[in-house]
Amino acid sequence: MQFSLGANLFFWPKTQVETFYQQAMTCEADIIYLGETVCSKRRELRIHDWLNLAKEIAKSGKQVVISTMTLLESAAEIQTLKKYCANGDFLIEANDLSAVQILHDYQLPFVAGPAINCYNLSTLKVLLKQGMFRWVMPVELSKDWLASLLSQAQQSSIRQQFECEVFSWGYLPLAYSARCFTARSENRAKDDCQYCCINYPQGRKMKSQEGEQVFTLNGIQTMSGDQYNLVNEVNNMQAIGVDVIRISADNNQAFDKLRQFKQQLASPQYFPLDKNTECNGYWYQIAGMAKVN
């Protein structure tokens, strides 16, 4: 089993991003994803910056994957996507079907990211024909659903053709919209957002009228209010055939989580979830914000 550090989903200053990935070079992750997946206006790092950063990380011996945008809204964004896909050095995580098609046209293998709506065996087969070699399960699906689908893949003799990766810690990316919720929360138009996302390095918290934290606003992305945590499921995931466990790169705590998750393989330990900040409901096919201890 391998461990991955998912792409940072938030908007940070360039120096903070570079410092974070300098630390990532010596972390427990076998695979490091990086790149802008949420908003093309987040230009603290341009394409050459991301690729140069990827080259530096690759020197540490880790597999580097460039993650692409989840919602493409212009011809310019498609052109940028094509440049990433044609980088010539690094694998790509496709988070939109346009990326899947471009990579198929280029005859390049790819990772199907969690934003790709792949819920059944038929879709898995389509993605495999397109060139997928690793599939990241959509975050809202359950352990039982995953076990069933992997079993179906085994029975269809395609299971050995792809790796399975599960988002296992961090704020869950739940939905995407052409509207920018962070800008709206500051009474700004999207076209005049003044890059306000950078003021919320872990997103902007959103509470219900009852005062319960339900979501995290991150630009056009709506995330879970609590951090998803499957630390007690590492060995169960291994047993059903998960190949890669993903830790989201949302702050320096991610490095501690990588160590903690990896240690579960050698010496399993039970960690009760924090009732105020963590959740794991989706894994048990119940409300995502629920906590099962």
Where do the language-model regions lie?
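Active-site pocket-lining/capping segments in soluble small-molecule metabolic enzymes
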Residues: 1-118, 122, 126, 137-293
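Acidic/polar active-site rim loop that often engages polyanionic ligands
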Residues: 126-132
